[in-house]
Structure formats: structure tokens, C-alpha cells
Amino acid sequence: MEAYIVAGYRSAVGKAKRGGFKNYRTDDLAVDVIKHLASQVPELDTTKVDDVIVGCANPEGEQGLQVARLISARALGKEVPGVTINRYCASGLEAISMAVSKVRAGFGHIFVAGGIESMSLIPMTGYKLSPSYKANQENMNYHIGMGHTAEAVAEKYKISREASDQFSYESHQKAANAIEKGLFKDEIVPVTVEEVFVQDGKKVSKSHTVDMDEGVRRETTVEALSKLRPAFKLGGIVTAGSSSQMSDGAAFVLVMSEEMFKQLGVKPIARMVTCTSGGVDPLYMGIGPVEAIPKALSQAGLKLSDIEQTELNEAFACQALAVIQESGLNPDTVNVNGGAIALGHPLGCTGAKLSIQLLNEMKRRNQKYGMVTACVGGGQGIAGIYERL
């Protein structure tokens, strides 16, 4: 039984700790997005959804207490279960892959899958960092910081500071152009955030609407980027300007079996051909996609030249450049509307967000095959290939 993506929507991406979602819980944000997603398929009886699969990199605090179950009950009904999964930066893409796999296995007909992350409310390493002593004895790089892995990748694959700054500048320019053209408008769910607080002893409320990605800096220049200090290593090349932004966001797709979409009279937009992961030395975490991409192509029976467009998560500029260099990707078809350096990287949300962006841009360009790929903390890579219908 084949699985198909029927629709997909995302929130705008907020700047962590100072953006429009800084005080907004991601379970609330997910409910907003999923309710909108369901409303776009009026034929759907939401109580018949088999499961809601939510990717989340830090499922604790406001994202804990089995957050997926809370989301499923509030967004679709108490009859609908929910499960939270974690493959760190790839969690959203993994959630879609799991939904597709369940349909293909005959374990259900309708799934909502995607991801969430609030980097405003939850610390990047969680509330209690507790590395394994035994693991560190075996290999101290098992728990190495992501910025240091980026520096290791830059050194090993000879990525220069100049190339990294230029890549970062281009990410912002492409993203700014996309926003000015309204390319993300149809996929973003406007979210009204209501805030209640005490002022002069009185209860005060105010609201604002977030409907545009907040991290893009049209005014940035290569010169300005070149003046930033290294963020992780003395004499290194990785700066705040060439790193992905800390962000808040949510993104979800609706996955159905062929039997179900025909029964409902719904037209699918794409299918996930395959999705697979690979492992690499944690020291060179960012190169993970180089392991995952060939595996995905082999499983799909495709060549790299068949992939007309790729969304490569820009964890760091040097990391993205190394992946493009080592995997043989065509730079002209990678992140055509900018990437995480400009648009942000809400960890567990990103894989689903990139999938939605990819499918919409493939439609505009009338393309058949596209790929989403990302490195994953701890030394992994993931690649998912989509066929637009």
C-alpha cells in the first residue's frame, strides 16, 4: 500500500528568545498549524487520523509530558493518539518517514507528521546535561559541541573563512528575495499570539500576529560578516553569522494511503520515495549527509542527476559547503530560497519545514524529484527523496 502526502503547512520561523514566539509554547503552535492543515482537507474526519507523529529534539519542559499526545487531543480530538520521536535535527523528517512507513506496512491510513521546537523556552542541551562518563572514556567526541564539529569539518575539507562568509551572505539574499516575492506566503500559517501579564497591578493582554520568517537580514554584507569574531575556536572560521539561527517553529504534513485519498476524493501532491540515515565520526558530524545521500539514491533507484532540487539544512556554512563539495551536489539547485543561516533552524521542526518548502518550490518549477538532507548531532546524516505528483 503506497503512502502519499496530501498537504503540508508550517508556521513562520521565529527568532529564539527575542522573536514573535519567544513566549509561545510549541504545543500551542503545533495545534494552530495542525488545525489549519486539517481545515484545508474538509473531506477529512479528523477523529479518523491514526496517529500524530511529532519530531522534537528536546522533549522536556514545555515540550515534555508526551507533548505529541497533548497536541493530537487538542488539534484533532481525544480519539487521536500522538507519539513524540527524536532524531535531533532530523526529527521532523524522521516523523514523515515513519508515517509513510506505517502506511506502506498497512498499519494505518491517515497520519499527521512533522516537528516542533522552541529554542526560546527550552535550552539547547536540555535542563540537565549529563554526558556519559563511559562514552567519554571511549571517545571524547561523542559529546563534542556542534560548533567545534563545524570547525573540524572546515579544517578537514579545507573550507575557507571567505567561502563561508560568502555562502552566508548568499543565504540571506536568496531568502530575502523569496520573501519579497511572497514565495513562502501560501505555506505559512499566520499565528496570533496572545500575551497576558500584570502591569501596575492590573491584568493586561496584548496580541500580535507572526506570519513571516524573522531571521532574514537583507542588509547584511560580506564585509560585515568578515568582521565577526570566531564563535567556537580561537583562530577558527565559524562565526555567529555563518551558523544557523536558534529558532522557534512548527511544521506538519498530512499523509494518506491511496485507498483513503481516493475514498475522500483528495488529490495528493507528492510521495516520499525513500528516507534513510547514515552514521559518521561525531567529530565530523556535519558531513553526515554525504553518507546518507548515496544510500537514499540507491534505495530510490535514482542518480544524483535525477534530483532537480535539494534542501540542505545549513547547520553551518562550512558544513553545507563541505557536503556540497563531497557529495557532488549542484550548488545552483541547493537551497534556492536560502537556508537555515537566514531562515532559522528550529531543530525538531526543520526536516518537516524543509520538506514543505521543497514541495512548494518543486511545484513552481514543475520538477519531479527533490531531496531534503541534513546533518544530525552525534554524527549522523539523513536524506529523504520526494516525487512530486
Language model region names:
Residues 24, 58-109, 141-148, 219-245, ...:
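Conserved catalytic cysteine-centered active-site region
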Residues 21-110, 115-133, 188-210, 283, ...:
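Conserved beta-ketoacyl condensing-enzyme motif
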Residues 1-26, 221-287, 291, 298, ...:
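Condensing-enzyme catalytic core mediating Claisen C-C bond formation in acyl metabolism
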Residues 10-12, 23, 27-32, 43, ...:
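N-terminal extracellular/periplasmic Venus flytrap/periplasmic-binding protein-like
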Residues 87-116, 154-184, 252-259, 324, ...:
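Active-site-proximal alpha-helical scaffold in enzymes
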Residues 26-42, 67-71, 95, 146-153, ...:
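Short, well-ordered amphipathic alpha-helical segments that serve as non-catalytic structural scaffolds
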